């Protein structure tokens, strides 16, 4: 397919009577259009173009970007909040448990010497009576402190109830990330194929002088600047 610029050049050569130059230009255009590399590049361009169009109009991508990602962000914030609340409750309960445990430990240390004397048979009757009273007091203390410890441990256990709900939220976010990853891999695969094809044909393409980037597309009537124009161009080339 001859371009507008090439058609203008061909007409100009014919008007100037430069028949040989016109024939060479026509032969170049014809051979370029029937070049296998040209066809491969055209087909690859069509595939890439369609993939990009599908990427742009994919309603699922739009839904993910506008709805599910913001929703996932809010859900993760919720997980952070619930985790923070549970951590604070747990730490507060532990802080309340520590003095109780320390007090029990100190009481046991105070009674241990007399208890060792009793076990070794080296205790007087008066000390034995005193030991019995102290043990009775210790039992009462243990009874009260153990009840308090049980309450604090229950508080710690209840603070962990967030895990079931937050676990479900995290799994949902992971599924969303996996879906986004899958769709991005599909897009990258298309680009990867384009790059591989470009490298394979690099030596051949080097023999064709490139026109270079279009620096003033608004002034060029042969430049494409929209999706519809790309479609029309590819269709006119037979792809």
From Swiss-Prot:
Protein name as it appears in the record: Protein phosphatase CheZ
Function: Plays an important role in bacterial chemotaxis signal transduction pathway by accelerating the dephosphorylation of phosphorylated CheY (CheY-P).
Pfam families reported in the protein's UniProt record: CheZ
Gene Ontology BP annotations: archaeal or bacterial-type flagellum-dependent cell motility; chemotaxis; regulation of chemotaxis
Enzyme Commission no: 3.1.3.-
Keyword line: Chemotaxis, Cytoplasm, Flagellar rotation, Hydrolase, Protein phosphatase
Coiled coil location: none
Family: Belongs to the CheZ family.
InterPro entries the record matches: Chemotax_Pase_CheZ, CheZ_family_phosphatases
Name of the gene: cheZ
Site (Enhances dephosphorylation of CheY-P): 168
GO MF: phosphoprotein phosphatase activity
Primary site of residence: cytoplasm
GO cellular-component term (any): bacterial-type flagellum
Keyword NAD: no
């Amino acid at each position: 397919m001859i371009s507008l610029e090439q058609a203008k050049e061909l007409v100009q050569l014919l008007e100037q009577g430069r028949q040989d130059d016109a024939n060479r230009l026509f032969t170049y255009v014809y051979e370029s259009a029937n070049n296998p590399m040209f066809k491969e590049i055209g087909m690859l361009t069509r595939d890439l173009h369609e993939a990009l169009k599908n990427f742009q109009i994919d309603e699922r991508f739009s839904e993910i970007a506008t709805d599910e990602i913001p929703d996932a962000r809010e859900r993760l914030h919720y997980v952070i909040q619930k985790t923070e609340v549970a951590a604070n409750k747990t730490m507060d309960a532990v802080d309340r448990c520590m003095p109780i445990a320390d007090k029990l430990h100190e009481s046991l240390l105070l009674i241990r010497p007399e208890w060792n004397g009793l076990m070794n048979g080296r205790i007087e009757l008066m000390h034995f009576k005193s030991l019995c009273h102290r043990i009775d007091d210790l039992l009462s203390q243990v009874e009260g402190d153990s009840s308090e410890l049980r309450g604090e441990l229950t508080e710690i256990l209840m603070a962990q109830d967030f895990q079931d709900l937050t676990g479900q939220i995290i799994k949902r976010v992971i599924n969303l990330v996996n879906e986004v990853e899958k769709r991005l891999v599909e897009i990258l695969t298309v680009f990867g194929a384009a790059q591989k094809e470009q490298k394979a044909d690099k030596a051949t393409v080097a023999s064709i002088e490139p026109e270079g980037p279009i620096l003033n597309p608004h002034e060029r009537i042969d430049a494409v600047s929209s999706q519809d124009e790309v479609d029309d161009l590819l269709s006119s080339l037979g792809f």
